[in-house]
């Protein structure tokens, strides 16, 4: 019964792992709901400031802030939002594939690349893959603060403002629903015009700007970029927990199937051992 004992030991080990993955699935469900609440709470601000920026830009068509000016691209920057922890399926890998594909397209045009990496997994990936990481931050926790991001984002904004970076992208995972997380690459700078926005007619906008719209535009553009990065971090957190929940559920289900298969093998081995013992007893009795 040596084989049966080994199988029994494997079954016990897998059951122990199954309990862990099942517990992690339940924890991920709870954290995902909290992350969804944070995402929903921050979204109205991000959308509203986008509208305000659009209206300010429309109110001053002759004024072009440096963040809104197109120029020849010699160096691009990426703000990459990854996770701090693993065990979330292919969430990070799928994101890195989208990023590397875009980086390669720029490299083929002899354009240099700078990276600002948010999340430990991104930092670890680019340490082995290679890349000019000019800013990095990790260990943001379950409730990230926009104040934690300002320093790293400022490095990239200063680079664009001073002409070291000619285009800036934000790379993160969008939370579509519990089953779907989509890696996306959006251009942050220069600020592209919102083609879907309708022109504002006089009397339809309920704000008065003091001292004037131009000065507000200068101040709000930085806040706008920071809010977009923060929204991406919060949304990426919800996507992470959803992906982890799915990964742990799949692991738990696979463990159950493996236990069933091993249980069948164990029963067959035990049956074969009992049959052999009976045959030996019958053979011994016949010899006597």
Curated annotation (Swiss-Prot):
Gene Ontology annotations for the cellular component aspect, listed alphabetically: plasma membrane; proton-transporting ATP synthase complex
KW Cell membrane (keyword) present: yes
Protein's cellular compartments: Cell inner membrane
Domain of life: Bacteria
Keyword Transcription: no
This protein's UniProt keywords: ATP synthesis, Cell inner membrane, Cell membrane, CF(1), Hydrogen ion transport, Ion transport, Membrane, Transport
Membrane topology classification: Peripheral membrane protein
A Pfam family that the UniProt record links to this protein: ATP-synt
Record PROSITE patterns: ATPASE_GAMMA
Gene Ontology MF term list: ATP binding; proton-transporting ATP synthase activity, rotational mechanism
Cross-referenced SUPFAM superfamilies: ATP synthase (F1-ATPase), gamma subunit
GO biological process: proton motive force-driven plasma membrane ATP synthesis
Family as reported in the entry's similarity comment: Belongs to the ATPase gamma chain family.
Function in brief: Produces ATP from ADP in the presence of a proton gradient across the membrane. The gamma chain is believed to be important in regulating ATPase activity and the flow of protons through the CF(0) complex.
HAMAP family, alphabetized: ATP_synth_gamma_bact (MF_00815)
Protein name, per record: ATP synthase gamma chain
